[in-house]
Amino acid sequence: MTKGILGRKIGMTQVFGENGDLIPVTVVEASQNVILQKKSEEIDGYNAIQVGYEDKQAYKKDSRSSKYANKPAEGHAKKAGTAPKRFIREFRNVNVDEYEVGQEVSVNTFEAGDVIDVTGVSKGKGFQGAIKRHNQARGPMSHGSHFHRAPGSVGMASDASRVFKGQKMPGRMGGNTVTVQNLEVVQIDAENNVILVKGNVPGPKKGFVEITSSIKGNK
């Protein structure tokens, strides 16, 4: 069955393994996870739990700022006996009977050695050219070349008379939802609500991440 938890990426560091190897790890803080809702096949068409992470500021009248919860979010969280949450996700393929609404989910859900998938929003790079954005090759940089970092041909002239959808062109790079699969949990620090994950995970420091059991590695 799937296990899952939400958290924030704190940054990277390194730890020593039992055999003395130096292991690069990403530190993920995962406290304040609360079950907001249980979904069942009879009512919702599928089984899942809805988990919320990190408290949001209470509803403020006449404020449209996203840092304040709205009334529906407050009412939804009130049913679970908790405050509105900033980061909410659902986890399917879980044993719903093991959870109750309002229950807290701790980092002890996972153990050292577990194989996990981590989902986050990649770092935004702004507007970039085709070479950086799509890893295309440069043209000749020598004297006389008219083609250095341009994207090249984007399609035929008279026959198609248009640029096809999906053509790799300059544009905004990053800021996409990315999942890195089959990462290893190196260490669990229950006292500080921290998970140490081997390697790097998507997103900037303080970015929200979603950790689930590996869809491939645990079969």
UniProtKB/Swiss-Prot annotation:
Statement: the UniProt record of this protein carries the keyword Lipoprotein: no
GO BP, one annotated term: translation
Presence of the UniProt keyword Cell wall biogenesis/degradation in the record: no
UniProt keyword terms in alphabetical order: Ribonucleoprotein, Ribosomal protein, RNA-binding, rRNA-binding
Region of interest called Disordered, as start-end residue ranges on this chain: 62-81, 136-156
Superkingdom, taxonomy of origin: Bacteria
Pfam families registered for this protein in UniProt: Ribosomal_L3
One Gene Ontology molecular-function label: structural constituent of ribosome
Recorded GO CC terms: cytosolic large ribosomal subunit
SUPFAM superfamilies tied to this protein: Translation proteins
PROSITE patterns named among the record's database cross-references: RIBOSOMAL_L3
Cross-referenced HAMAP family: Ribosomal_uL3_B (MF_01325_B)
Function (record text): One of the primary rRNA binding proteins, it binds directly near the 3'-end of the 23S rRNA, where it nucleates assembly of the 50S subunit.
Family: Belongs to the universal ribosomal protein uL3 family.
NCBIfam families linked: L3_bact
Complex formation: Part of the 50S ribosomal subunit. Forms a cluster with proteins L14 and L19.
Identification of the protein by name: Large ribosomal subunit protein uL3
Organism: Staphylococcus saprophyticus subsp. saprophyticus (strain ATCC 15305 / DSM 20229 / NCIMB 8711 / NCTC 7292 / S-41)
Organism phylogeny: Bacteria, Bacillati, Bacillota, Bacilli, Bacillales
